[in-house]
Swiss-Prot record:
Residues 43-54 are annotated as: Interaction with NGFR. The chain crosses the membrane at residues 6-26, 62-82, 89-109, 115-132. This is Novel acetylcholine receptor chaperone. Its main location: membrane. It is found in: Peroxisome membrane; Cytoplasmic vesicle; Endoplasmic reticulum membrane. The gene is TMEM35A. Belongs to the DoxX family. Residues 1-5, 83-88, 133-167 are cytoplasmic. Residues 27-61, 110-114 are lumenal. Signal peptide: none annotated.
Length: 167
């Protein structure tokens, strides 16, 4: 049976991956929701207006929206389907992307309800990355003492009068 850690990582990976595939697709095409697509277009226009540096670099709202959407779809697919290290790399890129989106929302002065989802999914991405990068805990296995393990007493052996003997 899989460990709880593995189940948690897989569940978070699939849920986050599907969410980002969905959100990235909304940024790329109006087929899923015309209203959400229109809202994304409007939001990205305000982001570019609020950050003139993007305009100077030749990045317009369409390019920004489509590049972020494509990155979300690609990383979401990796998070959902690809095993191993690429999943952690996709997680890291999505976390950076969420931080950039939070920056954009703050820059234009959006209320919390407009970017609460980004905050929650940023926290979930952070949790998934921390759980995935934490080494497996093997404390349940007994580690032999150096030398001959039978000759060395344990640290807390029972003494004859019920006292704990510490060596």
């Amino acid at each position: 049976m899989a460990s709880p850690r593995t189940v948690t990582i897989v569940a978070l990976s699939v849920a986050l991956g599907l969410f980002f595939v969905f959100m990235g697709t909304i940024k790329l095409t109006p087929r899923l929701s015309k209203d959400a697509y229109s809202e994304m277009k409007r939001a990205y226009k305000s982001y570019v207006r609020a950050l003139p540096l993007l305009k100077k670099m030749g990045i317009n709202s369409i390019l920004l929206r489509k590049s972020i959407g494509a990155l979300e779809v690609a990383c979401g697919i990796v998070m959902t389907l690809v095993p191993g290290r690429p999943k952690d790399v996709a997680n890291f890129f999505l976390l950076l992307l969420v931080l950039a989106v939070l920056f954009f929302h703050q820059l234009v002065g959006d209320p919390l309800k407009r970017y609460a989802h980004a905050l929650v999914f940023g926290i979930l991405l952070t949790c998934r990355l921390l759980i995935a990068r934490k080494p497996e805990d093997r404390s349940s296995e007994k580690k032999p003492l150096p030398g001959n393990a039978e000759e060395q007493p344990s640290l807390y052996e029972k003494a004859p009068q019920g006292k704990v003997k510490v060596s």
